[in-house]
Curated annotation (Swiss-Prot):
The active site is at residue 84. It comes from Arabidopsis thaliana. This is Disease resistance protein LAZ5. It is an enzyme of class 3 (hydrolase). The gene is LAZ5. Pfam families: C-JID (PF20160), LRR_3 (PF07725), NB-ARC (PF00931), TIR (PF01582), WHD_ROQ1 (PF23282). GO terms for molecular function: ADP binding; ATP binding; NAD+ nucleosidase activity, cyclic ADP-ribose generating. Gene3D superfamilies: Helical domain of apoptotic protease-activating factors (1.10.8.430), P-loop containing nucleotide triphosphate hydrolases (3.40.50.300), Ribonuclease Inhibitor (3.80.10.10), Toll/interleukin-1 receptor homology (TIR) domain (3.40.50.10140).
Length: 1170
């Protein structure tokens, strides 16, 4: 075979697929000349009789950008042409190739349907038995005849040739432009992926569709005939290719990521099995359900004797009735439109025997109700084993019980989103750089939804930068018309209650806690018991999403919903009024519209003009108000804000239906007498002026949350005495509250009570709230006595109180998980039965300066993970095997840390900063990952070996690949101690190298340490004075045994330095160079994050893996290599690196090391003296 030139190019722009005997010496020769003149590279098979082996041809197809398939009258006689076409269509479906059909003296429909003269050439004279016939048929059916060029439409061959060349140029320009756009937006893509925006789609993988609107019906010719003319919809947005009157070709965008989606669907359907499979394709509006179903159908329909794609079943049912669906399905499957099929609900029974004869492949698109499925499928007993059924729907919950499996179509990934958007926004034109940068706003807003990406692309196409910037400002305010039309159809299918809750979430409760939202909307109609399920229904319809325990909504849905709610203000839309925009609220109040239609008001008082005040009867006629929030978006934590209510007249709140009342800085002493909290779920009055909630006691049967925080005048809580279902009560900062009422015992559901900074509270009287699980009394500075008010407490916070001890009953809190007594400076002892708290995981005693011991029975705590004893006088800690983190900082009583510390078998973190009398550090547990003895200025010696049981070079499962040991400002360390630290560092580096080699770890391992000193350890075989090191590596320095790099820097901190506040890092930039290439990268050696001055010089040692070297192949391993290392500090301008060192860490075989360990003296081996 030969190419179009003597030297084969690396790739071809055009592969020409044709029947040689028909065209080679005529049309093809002229085409080749025209392509050459146009500078277009192409591939033509010049062999008269092609080889049986088509591998080379297939490779050429894979290397091409465009396949030019020229169909002539004798084309179907050539099995080589047909095999090429099969390969071409495979590449087209993968989105890796574009096909340009040319019909040369043959009709496009004959090619697609394999009939007429073309069909005779394919099937005639016994050829129908050829084994590849099914593949050829499928490929021919897939040829997009609409985008083809037909010789019959041109005056002569030259005119056709000119059009082919022109069309190829346009397509190549699009490919080049798309590539440039992708490259220029690559940074945006990386930013999007790095931020990992919580998208609406439950899945985060790529999106398979070529269509941006899966809610429109298909336009395939074979199915258009099945739909009455009046019901046919327009073509999809820029996805159906057409031939203009002038013959120009407009190509559709490629099927981005379609193959992985098809593969997942094919796995679910298992086409090779004899089992009947029913699979639902679901997802939010515009995500590509229909496109995926269409593509799947077109690929597999020829494998079944009976098949049908039923477009837009929901719309067909609305226009023609339910029974029409069944009739149309049966007529298509039985291939007889003259059958006398009635309009009963189960006509399948009359045709059952015939239907059971053959397997079927059915794709039912856009089903919206169970009734539609039941009408279409009846009892399901007419479907032959091995049949495959696919149903697409926007309602996943509706499909349950009908399908055995569902596939949720995921959103587009970042790269495909970029390409999809730019394909529509720029077309064949080059994207302007300033517009490319603005694209990220639309990409972030669309979050991979192809409907939104395509719609915005079309809207912006041809517009200038000013138009783009203007649209960005209105993204969240005004819906795109195309998006709006699709979403409006979905909205209209909801029940009235679903519509209300959908709008409530969008306008008021987006991103709120799921349980909270469910409870608030659950009580929208007190007589209804079904409201709890409305959020679940909306989730099943992909109109809301539960992510991280919160109710989320895609931005396009939220904008649509808010726009719909805003229209209710000026139009008779039968939608309740939801007001959150200050201007809308003012307009509504000034025009005195129907107050009883208001459902919710969220008023940001910081937006209200200073000169405006509100009358006390503003809410008097809002009898249906359910949600009221008055707040300030610029209000500081202390509640400073501008609120402009006329406080002369008492407010009137005759709101019987209110569910949510949030009023920041409520200015009156109590809620008015006409306020009825019978339906109240959440009461929020932070920073208010109330002295009591309301007059007397009122029934609050469904109140679950009450927040009265920082209501500094509050003294009386009796008004909430009947809140039997109250779960959370926040009284933080209520500085006038002296005590809790005895009637709180009626709060049978209370689980959370926050009384932080209730500085007038002196004691907790003997009340019992057995349901309470979390009690916060932090910074109740006058609280001297604590009584156990619930034996079911799980978290107890007494930090900052004046208590001197815990009552004996505290030992009976067997469910307690967290006990925080930080800063209890009067605390002298702990209960002897503290060890009975078997569930305790965190014990915080920081700053308890009088505490000298802990009970010995704490060793029996099997779940204690965190023990903070900093600022205490405790000298010894009982051995707690479960302990993972221990803090003993600022302990002035401890001189020698206990010898049995190495037995703390799960200890990962040990912090002993500023223990000014500590002199000795024993052997540390082998599992320890982090040690910090910063500022232990009297520390003199450490045990040798520093870490216990270092008898092997191989890490066991208790050890981690990342560890840090810091001895900063430990200026009295003996030289032996420094040597022990250095030797441990060498040993750790060797161990990590072995582990990285054994487990084939290329990244993630890291170790660093620092200690006072000015000498680079001798085991660094490359050393230099200053901050630059340039060792020369001999040939073959890089081999499979290389696992890591050890680096050392001696940092000098000047005596006149400013105190170092915050953090600084020691880094090294490495550049490997030889005659054939270079590689540059940065490594971290260590960092410090301690306030104060670093005194004297310090040695920093770090180990990093060779991942950058292993990932880079431009440095040939057999050449000598020079390494330039530049050591430097960040955020420590008055300090500098004065000496440095470097060592490559190699590993050996496991057997050799074990033999050395067995035969060598351990001490000598450990010290690295062999």
């Amino acid at each position: 075979m030969a190419a179009s030139s003597e030297i084969l190019p690396e790739s071809w722009q055009v592969f020409i697929n044709f029947r040689g005997a028909d065209l080679r010496n005529g049309f093809i020769s002229h085409l080749a000349g025209a392509l050459t003149s146009a500078g277009i590279t192409y591939y033509i098979d010049t062999e008269e009789v092609p080889s049986e082996d088509l591998t080379v041809l297939f490779k050429r197809i894979e290397e091409s950008e465009i396949a030019l398939s020229i169909f002539s009258s004798n084309y179907a006689e050539s099995k080589w042409c047909l095999d090429e076409l099969v390969k071409i269509m495979e590449q087209v479906k993968k989105g890796k190739l574009r096909i340009m059909p040319v019909f040369f003296n043959v009709k496009p429909e004959e090619v697609r349907e394999q009939n007429g003269e073309f069909g005779l050439k394919l099937y005639g004279e016994g050829k129908s038995k050829r084994p590849n016939i099914p593949n050829w048929e499928n490929a021919l059916r897939s040829v997009p005849s609409k985008i083809g060029l037909n010789l019959a439409n041109f005056r002569n061959e030259k005119e056709l040739l000119d059009k082919i060349i022109d069309s190829i140029k346009k397509v190549l320009a699009r490919i080049t432009r798309a590539s440039r756009v992708a490259e220029s937006l690559n940074g945006i893509s990386k930013d999007s992926e790095a931020k990992n925006v919580d998208t609406f789609s439950p899945n985060s993988s790529d999106f398979p569709s070529t269509s941006i609107d899966d809610d429109l019906s298909i336009n395939s010719p074979q199915y258009q005939a099945t739909i009455p003319p009046a019901s046919r919809e327009g073509e999809r947005l820029n996805t159906i290719s057409t031939v203009s009157s002038t013959g120009s070709i407009e190509h559709p965008p490629p099927n981005y990521g379609i193959e992985p989606r098809l593969k997942e669907m094919e796995e679910k359907l298992d086409f090779d099995s004899l089992e009947t499979k029913t699979v639902g394709i679901v997802g939010m509006p515009g995500i590509g359900k229909t496109t995926l179903a269409e593509t799947l159908y077109r690929k597999w329909e020829h494998k079944f004797e009976r098949s049908m794609f039923f477009p837009d079943a929901s719309k067909m049912a609305n226009e023609h009735g339910m029974c029409w669906l069944q009739k149309r399905l049966l007529e298509e499957l039985l291939k007889d439109t003259n059958l006398n099929i009635g309009y009963t609900t189960n006509e399948h029974e009359f045709c059952k025997d015939v239907l059971l004869l053959k397997k079927v492949f059915l794709v039912i698109d856009n089903v919206s109700s169970e009734e539609q499925i039941e009408t279409l499928f009846g009892k399901w007993n007419w479907i032959k084993n091995g049949s495959k059924i696919v149903i697409t729907s926007s309602d996943e919950s509706m499909l349950k019980g009908f399908v055995k499996d569902t596939y949720v179509v995921p959103s587009l990934n970042s790269r495909d989103s970029l390409l999809w958007f730019t394909n529509h926004a720029f077309g064949l034109d080059d994207a302007q750089g300033n517009l490319v940068k603005l694209s990220k706003h639309f990409l972030n807003y669309a979050k991979g939804n192809p409907l939104a990406l395509g719609a915005f692309g079309v809207e912006l196409c041809g517009k200038d930068k000013a138009d783009w910037e203007k649209r960005i400002k209105t993204l969240t305010l005004i819906s795109n018309k195309m998006i709006q039309d699709v979403l409006r159809r979905r909205y209209d299918e909801l029940t009235e209650r679903q519509k209300d809750i959908f709008l409530d979430v969008a306008c008021f409760f987006k991103s709120e806690n799921e349980s909270y939202v469910r409870h608030v909307v659950n009580s929208c109609d007190s007589e209804s018991t079904k409201s709890w399920d409305e959020i679940t229904d909306l989730k099943g319809k992909f109109l809301v999403n539960i992510s991280g325990g919160r109710v989320e909504m895609h931005d396009i849905l939220c904008t649509f919903a808010k726009e719909l709610a805003s229209q209710a203000l000026t139009e008779d839309t039968r939608v309740h009024l939801r007001l959150w925009n200050y201007q809308d609220i003012m307009w509504f109040l000034n025009n005195e519209l129907e107050m009883e239609n208001v459902r919710g008001i969220f008023l940001d008082m910081s937006k209200v003009p200073e000169e405006m005040t509100f009358d006390g009867n503003i809410f008097s006629n809002m009898c249906n108000l359910r949600y009221l929030k008055i707040y300030s978006s610029v209000c500081h934590k202390e509640g400073e804000g501008i609120f402009k209510f006329d406080t002369v007249r008492e407010i009137q709140l005759p709101l019987d239906k209110v569910r949510y009342l949030h009023w920041m800085k409520y200015p009156w002493e109590k809620l008015p007498s006409d306020f009825n909290p019978e339906n109240l779920v959440d009461l929020e009055l932070p920073y208010s002026s109330i002295k009591k909630v309301w007059e007397g006691v009122k029934d609050t049967p469904i109140l679950k949350w009450a927040n009265l925080s920082y209501s500094s005048k509050l003294t009386n809580l009796l008004g909430l005495s009947n809140a039997k279902n109250l779960e959370r009560l926040n009284l933080e900062g209520c500085t006038s509250l002296l005590k809790l009422p005895q009637e709180m015992e009626n709060m049978k559901s209370l689980v959370f009570l926050n009384m932080r900074r209730c500085t007038s509270l002196t004691c907790l009287q003997s009340i019992k709230v057995s349901s309470l699980k979390i009690l916060i009394l932090s910074d109740c500075s006058k609280l001297e006595e604590f009584e156990v008010i619930s034996e079911n407490l799980e978290e107890l916070y007494l930090d900052g109180t004046a208590i001197k001890g815990l009552p004996p009953a505290a030992g009976d809190l067997t469910r307690l998980v967290v006990l925080n007594m930080e800063g209890c400076t009067e605390l002298e002892s702990l209960p002897k039965r503290l060890g009975k708290q078997k569930a305790l995981q965190e014990l915080v005693l920081s700053g308890c300066s009088k505490l000298e011991s802990v009970p010995t029975d704490v060793k029996d705590m099997k779940h204690l993970r965190l023990l903070l004893l900093d600022g205490t006088r405790i000298r010894k800690i009982p051995k707690i095997k479960s302990l993972k983190c221990l803090c003993l900082s600022r302990n002035i009583a401890m001189v020698n840390l206990q010898d049995n510390l190495k037995d703390f078998s799960n200890l990962k973190c040990l912090v002993m900063k500023n223990c000014e009398n500590l002199r000795y550090l024993p052997s540390l547990p082998k599992c320890l990952e982090y040690l910090n003895v910063y500022g232990c200025e009297r520390l003199e010696s450490v045990e040798n070996p520093l870490v216990a049981d270092r008898l092997t070079l191989f890490l066991d499962r208790s050890e981690e690949l990342r560890s840090t040991f810091l001895f900063t400002n430990c200026h009295n360390l003996f030289q032996d101690a420094k040597d022990s630290i250095s030797t441990y560092a060498k040993w750790k580096c060797h161990r990590l190298a072995v582990e990285c080699y054994e487990q084939d770890i290329v990244s993630g391992a890291f170790f660093n340490t620092c200690y006072p000193g000015y000498i680079v350890p001798s085991w660094f075989d490359h050393q230099a004075v200053g901050s630059v090191l340039e060792p020369r590596l001999e040939p073959h320095w890089y081999n499979t045994m290389l696992s890591g790099i050890a680096l050392c820097a001696v940092v000098s901190f000047h005596e006149n330095q400013d105190p170092i506040i915050g953090s600084f890092s020691v880094k090294c930039t490495l550049q490997f160079e030889n005659e054939d290439g270079s590689l540059r990268f940065d490594c971290d050696i260590g960092c410090l994050n301690e306030p104060g001055m670093i005194e004297a010089d310090h040695v920093f040692i770090g180990y990093v893996t060779c991942s950058r070297l292993k990932d880079h192949h431009s440095i040939p391993i057999h050449h000598p290599t020079t390494v330039k290392m530049q050591f430097h500090l960040t955020d420590a301008c008055k300090s500098k690196v004065v000496d440095c060192g470097f060592r490559l860490m190699y590993t050996q075989s496991r057997g050799c090391l074990l033999e050395e360990e067995v035969n060598a003296n351990f001490t000598k081996l450990y010290l690295g003296l062999l």
